[in-house]
Design a protein with these regions (language model features):
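Short amphipathic alpha-helical interface segments
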Residues: 1-25
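N-terminal glycine-rich phosphate-binding loop and ensuing alpha1 helix
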Residues: 8-12, 26, 59-130
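Conserved alpha/beta core of the MobA/IspD/sugar-nucleotide pyrophosphorylase nucleotidyltransferase superfamily
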Residues: 12-15, 58-73, 225-322
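A short, conserved structural fragment
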Residues: 41-51
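Conserved core of the sugar-phosphate nucleotidyltransferase
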Residues: 46, 177-256
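Conserved beta-loop-beta/alpha segment of the NTase-like Rossmann-fold superfamily
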Residues: 128-203
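ATP-binding glycine-rich phosphate-binding loop
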Residues: 329-353
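A conserved alpha-helical element in kinase catalytic cores
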Residues: 356-385
């Protein structure tokens, strides 16, 4: 992470910050900040006016920031979102609303506010539902033909050209950020992180004193974990994507998250998936620590219902409304929803009401063309007798 570049960025965004405020914004000590300010003044990156307490970027600072200007963003939106059924039977997870605003739209607006207009959405499941965004937000859509049976490692492989030679954010369509954490300039690759107290099954980070990622392990306790957006610098992508491509072409990696490639590089375990290959350089990536209540990754419908009360009793979902009517209970009492494997002609899920388990089956289009329901009933009746 170029700390002088980061200092110049903060001055660019707010030229009247105190050194204490600068230190907090950069997640460094006040003493380190004092040293950096002196270094920046000596190198004529910026000047300081003691009368009004303001900084001014000089040509050197402007030139330094030019190398770190953001080029683009890629938003992952190809998956089904099985833990959000029945909502995702009708709507991709990223198009679900939180407090009346679609999660993916909120992120696009935040990116635009930061001066990042070039946005690509990687689509798959219900891809046509994202087409309105081409005109509304000027985004590009990239189709992932393997979305239905492979994981995010494959998604990044298909989107790899969006990263090469560019400074690019990587976002998940179903994340929700309270405050805008994107910038016009980024001074080093990073992964957003939140602190998890107690035991967690998240991907836990090991870092150096300066915040450089040195290791990743799945599960731990009282740890900073991978959570939210990621920034891929040009330099990071140049080293990372050749390894990811090797993984993609290796059998047995189909269900991997892309983060597994990064974890293997940091942990020195690439040869566990690519036998005999140890020559890959480790790309530098830093932790970007976020405060509590800033980044949200909703793991399931229950978490979303706790966060946005609208989903407790009025989800605007046909299946939940029907269950509510048939069983004569408010939607808030429909719990324990779990997706069942989708059949040829229908979609099904388990749920509970007052501790009793039920199955809801939603007939799909073409059901009556494939199945004669009268004949099916006659067969069932004959079996019973």
């Amino acid at each position: 992470m170029d700390r002088l570049g980061l200092l110049c960025r903060n001055i660019y965004e707010n030229n009247k910050m105190t050194q204490r405020e600068l230190a907090a914004a950069m997640d460094i000590s006040l003493g380190t900040c004092n040293h950096l300010v002196k270094e920046g003044l000596d190198q004529e990156l910026f000047s300081f006016d003691p009368v009004d307490g303001s900084y001014s970027l000089l040509k050197g600072g402007v030139d330094l920031l030019r190398n770190y200007r953001m080029d683009s963003a890629v938003i992952l939106a190809a998956g089904f979102g099985s833990r959000f059924v029945p909502l995702t039977f009708e709507t991709p997870k990223g198009l679900l609303e939180v407090y009346g605003e679609r999660m993916i739209e909120r992120q696009i607006k935040q990116l635009h506010e930061a001066g990042v207009p070039d946005i690509t959405i990687v689509v798959g499941y219900l891809k046509e539902t994202f087409e309105y965004m081409i005109d509304k937000f000027g985004v590009k859509l990239l189709y992932n033909p393997e979305y239905h049976n492979k994981n995010t490692l494959t998604t990044l492989y298909h989107a790899r050209e969006c990263f090469i030679g560019r400074n690019t954010y990587l976002l998940s369509s179903d994340n929700w950020m309270r405050n805008n954490m994107y910038h016009t300039y980024e001074c080093g690759a990073w992964y957003s992180s939140v602190y998890m107290k107690g035991e967690t099954s998240e991907w836990c980070l090991e870092t150096s004193k300066k915040g450089l990622l040195t290791g990743v392990k799945v599960g731990g306790e009282d740890s900073w974990v991978m959570y939210g957006p990621v920034f891929f610098s040009k330099e990071f992508s140049e080293k990372f994507f050749p390894v990811l491509e090797e993984y993609y072409h290796t059998p047995g990696t189909e269900q991997m998250y892309w983060e597994q490639v990064l974890a293997d590089l940091l942990n020195g375990e690439v040869d566990s998936h690519l036998p005999g290959k140890h020559h890959f350089p480790v790309p530098g990536m830093y932790v970007n620590r976020q405060p509590d209540n800033q980044v949200y990754e909703f793991e399931n419908l229950e978490e979303l219902r706790l966060f946005d009360e609208r989903y407790r009793n009025h989800s605007d979902n046909i299946a939940r409304e029907l269950i509510s009517q048939v069983l004569q209970v408010p939607e808030s009492e429909i719990t324990g929803i779990k997706c069942l494997k989708t059949g040829m002609t229908n979609k099904s899920f388990l749920f509970k009401v007052h501790g009793k388990s039920y199955i809801c089956r939603i007939p799909g289009p073409g059901t009556e063309l494939l199945i004669n329901r009268k004949q099916e009933k006659a067969v069932n009746d004959s079996v019973k007798t």
